[in-house]
Amino acid sequence: KLGDYIKTVNESAGNDYEIELSVDETDQPTTLAEHYIIADQCLKGGMKLVSLAPRFIGDFEKGIDFIGDLDALHASLKDHAAVADVLGPYKLSLHSGSDKVSMYGLLANATQGRFHVKTAGTSYLEALRVVARHDPSAFREIIDFSRGRYETDKATYHVSATLADAPLTSEADDATL
């Protein structure tokens, strides 16, 4: 129904639109059967699917490189790309893609260039670096607020970092921040 709504609203307004479907925020990798069923049903329903972000094998923590077996990942990427070719073609999307340098070439190869990498985290970190350099007190406020929210907010992400991994702002000089 959401796909129908998006289509109706955009077409009636004369707007072009596209859908990127994300199913990557799960504990288990997306199976090929799940990928097929999800994409097939969306496409049969008239959804303008441009890319799909499955949950791939391995670990995709925010801000660090891929953790896992690269050969197994490459084989899995090829399999998911084959599903996308049969049903679409549409792009495979890598969410939590920031800093996954070891797998970018594998993704490009497996998809023959039909891929999307979501790197919003890197842009956010670069923005924080600018704040730290130009307004250290504002950066300290952001860090203190973030530390206060970390235990709650990390529940929605796959991360292994702990608060003990980072110094308190009161213990760090501006250059360290």
Language model feature labels by segment:
Residues 1-14, 27-177:
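Active-site capping/gating regions of soluble enzymes
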Residues 18-25:
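Short glycine-rich or small-residue beta-strand-to-loop segments that form or flank ligand, phosphate
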